[in-house]
Structure formats: C-alpha cells, structure tokens
Amino acid sequence: MKNQINRKFIYFICCVSAMGGLLFGYDWVVIGGAKPFYETFFGIEADPAMQGLAMSIAIAGCLVGAMVAGFFADLFGRKPLLLFSAIVFLLSAYMTGAVDTFVPFLIARLIGGVAIGVASGMSPMYIAEVSPPATR
C-alpha cells in the first residue's frame, strides 16, 4: 500500500513539475490573444518593430533564464528554484496586466521570460531527481 501511495505522489509531483514546461506555450497563447488590445492601448499598432519586441522580449528572458538556471539550482536547489520561478512568473503576469506604459510592460514580459526559462530548464531535472530509478 505504501508503495502505491508513493507512486501516486511521485506521479503528482511529476505532473505539477511538468507544468513548468507548459508556461512557454501558455505565455504565447495569452499574449497572442491580448495582442490587439495592448497594441491599441500602448499605441503601437502602426509600429511593427515595437509589436515584435512586445512579443519576442519574453524569448530573450527565456534564454537568460535557461542559461542561469543550472547555476542557481546548484546554489539553492531545484525545488526552491522552481517555486521561486513560479512566484516570479505570477508576479510578472500581474505586472503585465497592471502597468499603463509600454516600457514597464516590456520589463514585465522580460521578467516573465526569465521565469519561464528557469522553469523549462529545471522541470525535467527535478522530475528526474524525484523519480525512482526503476521508473526513469
């Protein structure tokens, strides 16, 4: 019975951790749906360069987050780093919706991208760490 409970718990942990990989797609779907509205709100509907920057700055953040994730995981641990990246992503999502000028919007998107990059890099590592060797 105990083995079954542990197995279910491991599956639960793996499913929750795998959601870190979903953040990238989630971010693109949400920002894509909001695109017509924030372009009008920030007055960038006639500026393709700014439109592209608003969409792609999160990818730059992902790159940074993925590059530093290993260093910080060694420093703080994978689980605390995953929790921290989730909190940072939530805060960046709030900031993205709460700001009223374009530059803070870009900063919030960049910070969210860093959190996505960290979570994307740490999720598979954490899943491998908590999984029993027989089921890896």
Question: Where do the language-model regions lie?
Answer:
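Transmembrane-helix signature of 12-pass secondary carriers
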Residues: 1-136
